[in-house]
């Protein structure tokens, strides 16, 4: 299984990429967005993980 990080996951281009990759059985996506509430749903959550910019900064 390949891991794919999508930066700017709340944007329009990312929405298209996420939808195309969601059909692939061999890809696990990590969606990164400054505001995770803007990530368009529904997406299958068993192959996706979301994280925000605030969390990354706080973990330092």
Curated annotation (Swiss-Prot):
It comes from the Bacteria. Residues 40-60 are annotated as: Disordered. InterPro entries: NAD(P)-bd_dom_sf. Missing about 170 C-terminal residues compared to orthologs. This is Protein YmjC. It comes from Escherichia coli (strain K12).
């Amino acid at each position: 299984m390949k891991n794919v990080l999508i930066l700017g996951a709340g944007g329009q281009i990312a929405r298209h990429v996420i939808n195309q990759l969601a059909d692939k059985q061999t890809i696990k996506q990590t969606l990164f967005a400054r505001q995770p509430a803007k990530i368009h749903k529904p997406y299958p959550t068993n192959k996706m993980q979301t994280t925000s910019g605030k969390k990354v900064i706080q973990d330092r």
